[in-house]
Amino acid sequence: MDGVHGWQGAYDAAGILAESVPPRALVDAAASAGCLITSDMPRALASAERLAPGKVARVSPLLREMHLEVPRWVRARWPLPVWAVCIHLHWLARERCGEIAAPSELQRAADAVALLDDASREAGTVVAVTHGAFRRLLALQLVAAGWRAERRVGGYQNWSSWPFSR
């Protein structure tokens, strides 16, 4: 499992590929937003810069990716893509059992909702650059706080968007 943990750490430390280009509609949304908020992880910072070059972004560790538990039921040495599938299947199984995240992660998502609430009151439209698993948790907390989820674009793919309104 040390290899898997090393891979997770390297992924967190990485930026984004030079050829990774956001869709025009997302670039336009980021450019016109009153506030751009991003996780403090390198790939989120790079994504924010790619979305809105030169725009000052607020940076918050509240929007960091949620670390998904490496399942202990996988005992063999497997290629990293197999581990990625097992990690996500384990997370989905825990979600189905009502355990989407640790209490500390749930609190962090609630704190992130408060951050986004405050930013939207100050600036109107907010674009938040965050990460897949945490975004799922954040989306649930936004809805619980009275926000309305609109049609998602791109699911969990890079450059996807999950709009919400109040």
Model-derived regions: residue spans:
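Glycine-rich phosphate-binding loop signature in dinucleotide/nucleotide-binding domains
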Residues: A30-A31, L116-G124
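Active-site-proximal alpha-helix that buttresses catalytic centers in soluble enzyme cores
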Residues: M1-L62, P79-A110
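Short aromatic-enriched loop/helix-cap "lid" or pocket-rim segments at secondary-structure transitions
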Residues: M1-G3, E69-V74, L140-Q141
